[in-house]
Curated annotation (Swiss-Prot):
Family per record: Belongs to the G-protein coupled receptor 1 family. Opsin subfamily.
Motif 'Ionic lock' involved in activated form stabilization mapped to chain: 134-136
Signal peptide extent: none
Extracellular side: 1-36, 97-110, 174-202, 275-286
Marked site positions, Plays an important role in the conformation switch to the active conformation: E113
Cystines in this chain: C110-C187
MF term (GO), any: 11-cis retinal binding
Record's GO cellular component terms: membrane; photoreceptor disc membrane; plasma membrane
Cytoplasmic side of membrane: 62-73, 134-152, 225-252, 309-354
SUPFAM superfamilies: Family A G protein-coupled receptor-like
Gene from which the chain derives: rho
Protein name in the entry: Rhodopsin
Residues the record marks as carrying a glycan: N2, N15
């Protein structure tokens, strides 16, 4: 084995030289230069500095403006809540451990950080699945006269938390475990060892199939069908200017959604899966550190993509920030009135987010 396994940790370095120490008790500067740990702390500070206000503002604006309290926005609010879970439960812990060079909070703190980071990430992931299904049902209309109402939204929110807990909870009760990873300053599921005492192998397989592969398939299917439906609608309307514009907007939004998902999660999942199927392989701490920390950036990507691209929400946010006045409202209202007739056929199909 090219790593050193302890009771509740796995350091990706052989202990032949005798320098490896528990990441709960000693700084891990033998894994990297001190400035590298400082860089991680600075990165986490950036995510907190951006993710906290954007997600909090999302909640505040939606509560303040009644017209935003639509069923679809329940899912978007839930997405913001999940991002805040990652910020408060994961990022704040990681910034402190990175500044100290090791996981100073011990195994209990590792469970805390790993649980909330995983929970927030999984709620966010399953929110994307619910959004994809909602778009598919509304735009592609596989069920005639389907309307996405408050009851559907509440069911969707509950579903995201049930699925997230079914992924983040088991390591706390003996099915797999949370251990420090990469430079040993953040915690995640143990992909590094089989650990038969906690049936680690079966949990990792379950996690990859149920909590990564299936969501990815659902998202690709739903948005793939959505793009096809929009193109068919455009062809039937002789590709009018408004329809072409709507098609471009929806296509751009879908591409950004899918690409953001892939950028955030595929590198982390791919590296984790590689390590899992190549137990004991030789890899540097950065091999897991970079994708693990990059996946955390989803807490910033999510509100930017799913909230800030929502025109209605954007107008309400500007109004809130500008203390009740929107300096762009007059210009936008003039533009909207000019295209109201053309856009009615598109909005009736609910092609764009509510």
């Amino acid at each position: 084995m090219n790593g050193t396994e302890g009771e509740n940790f796995y350091v990706p370095m052989s202990n032949k030289t005798g320098v490896v120490r528990s990441p709960f008790d000693y700084p891990q500067y033998y894994l990297g230069e001190p400035w590298m740990f400082s860089a991680l702390a600075a990165y986490m500070f950036f995510l907190i500095l951006t993710g906290l206000p954007v997600n909090f503002l999302t909640l505040f604006v939606t509560i303040q403006h009644k017209k935003l309290r639509q069923p679809l926005n329940y899912i978007l609010l839930n997405l913001a809540v999940s991002d805040l879970f990652m910020v408060f439960g994961g990022f704040t812990t990681t910034i402190i451990t990175s500044m100290n060079g090791y996981f100073i909070f011990g195994p209990a703190g590792c469970n805390f950080e790993g649980f909330f980071a995983t929970l927030g990430g999984e709620v966010g992931l399953w929110c994307l699945v619910v959004l994809a299904i909602e778009r598919y049902m509304v735009v592609c209309k596989p069920m005639a006269n389907f309307r996405f109402g408050s009851q559907h939204a509440i069911i969707g929110v509950v579903f995201t938390w049930i699925m997230a807990l079914s992924c983040a909870g088991p390591p706390l009760v003996g099915w797999s475990r949370y251990i420090p990873e990469g430079l040993q300053c953040s915690c995640g599921v143990d992909y590094y060892t089989m650990k038969p005492e906690v049936n680690n192998e079966s949990f990792v397989i379950y996690m990859f199939v149920v909590h990564f592969t299936i969501p990815l398939i659902v998202i690709f299917f739903c948005y793939g069908r959505l793009v096809c439906t929009v193109k068919e609608a455009a062809a039937q309307q002789q590709e009018s200017e408004s329809t072409q514009r709507a098609e471009r907007e929806v296509t751009r939004m879908v591409i950004i959604m899918v690409v953001a998902f892939l950028i955030c999660w595929v590198p982390y999942a791919s590296v984790a899966f590689y390590i899992f199927i190549n137990q004991g392989c030789d890899f540097t701490p950065f091999f897991m550190t970079v994708p693990a920390f990059f996946a955390k950036s989803s807490a910033v990507y999510n509100p930017l993509i799913y909230i800030l691209m929502n025109k209605q929400f954007r107008n309400c946010m500007i109004t809130t920030i500008c203390l009740g006045k929107n300096p762009f409202e007059e210009e936008e209202s003039t533009s909207a009135s000019a295209s109201k007739t053309e856009a009615s056929s598109v909005s009736s199909s609910q092609v764009a987010p509510a």
